[in-house]
Curated annotation (Swiss-Prot):
GO molecular function: zinc ion binding
Keywords per UniProt: Metal-binding, Zinc, Zinc-finger
Native source organism of the sequence: Caenorhabditis elegans
Zn finger (B box-type) location: 101-147
InterPro entries linked: E3_ubiquitin-ligase_RING, Znf_B-box, Znf_RING, Znf_RING/FYVE/PHD, Znf_RING_CS
Name the record gives this protein: Uncharacterized RING finger protein ZK945.4
Amino acid sequence: MNMLRCFPECGICGQEYSEDEKLLIPRILTECGHTICTGCAGKIKGQSSIIACPFDRIETRIWKKDVTRLKKNFSILEIKQEVKDRKNRVISEKNEKKERNKNGVCDENTNHHASNYCETCDADLCEECWTWIHSISTLAHHEKKMISTPDCQFHPGKSISLVCMRDRCKKRQNRLMCSECFLDKCSDHFEHEHSSLHLELPELRRNICSSLALYHEKEKKILANIGKLREIIATYSYDGEPFFQKKNELLRFRHFEMGEMDQAIKVLENEVVKRVRVLEYKISNQKLDLDWLQKNKDAIVKLSALPNMKLVQRKWELEVTVKRIEKDSAVRRPEFLADCSTCIVHVLSQRPLQIEMIPAFRLEIRECHRNEVRKFIENHSTRISSRSNILRYNCDFLEIIDRTEDLTIYSEGLRLIMIVDLLDGDRDRYFVALEQLEEAVAYEKIIVGLKSYSRGHGEAASNFLTKLADLHNKMPKITVVVNVDRSEDIEKIVNESII
């Protein structure tokens, strides 16, 4: 039986079995195993409760004289459905093939334009794929037939070979043209600027690939931001060690009257809730950015699946979507709140139940030689927490850190002090200092102290000062303090960093 041409049929009436028509449902005669349709079984049975098989005369008893009580032959029904599915697949493949032929796409590589047809393989192939597939000796004898691009709808017999570059035609999705369109005064593309169709396609595919790569890069950054925000939120847990330390600070530095302690703890918890709420709002903003990116990525993926000719027609739509990913979908840098461990519990002396959680200033200090800034802070501050290395300088709390956890993430209270000696003359040292400043997006404030500042420096120092001035214009958070050679200047730098 040819499965693509015939369906299983009843051996008595010759009609095809069908589950949709009651009389054509295949029924099994259980005593002998033969199958006939429901209609034939009813006719043979008549008024009797016994049916004799028309093929071998073996009798089968029917319960309550109802032939529908006989079991269906599901094997035949499954074969019928499989045949139907296979026919539908063949039709679908043929329709798909026609669509690809219409758009001139290579069957092996949809990014390429088909230029040859193989009748034996029933495939449209570009020159590269033809050579690769037919390099095997058993396929080398296949006949190659040249195929052309679709004809122009306005000039029959002329193949589409050009693409209109006018913005108006892009927006109207009317870009495909032949050589006659350019010369015909009645044409929509008369004397329009144009490009070759075969040059346009690779450029569009490259734009798709680069924008998808940029999407994955931005997605990674946003997910990193969300992860960092969640890490900080976790530090504010009431069951965590940092919050337990804050409650101890409250008990250690302030005496509360009877009944005030519980109220003070409640006020402290409310402060925590406020900070967590801000962090959660920042996460929701990052998620909105991610959703916008994903929406545009999905649009590009959908466009990339189009046949080449349709993709060329919709270039304007592709360009707009790519622009949204490349320019409009900037990764917003969240201004992270300090985590719970770096916050100080501050109780106002006049109002003991007005409690604040204030982040300690975290200072990263990069000095060229003598660590004068570190020594000044150590001599003019009081250590209030050995565990978290918190110092009190005047009325402010600060912590000296070695380096930031992530130089690309802005963080509350994070400050940088950099001291540069202009008499050093070391070009590499100047270059490293500038490089560090350019990448210092994480810092809330940056103080650059210049030692031995005077007119008439060497070439290396002069170049450094010029580039530093440019950086200062681009990054207002940079403050420059000159002539850092006395303790008063060091004090000015420290005070400048924590205001």
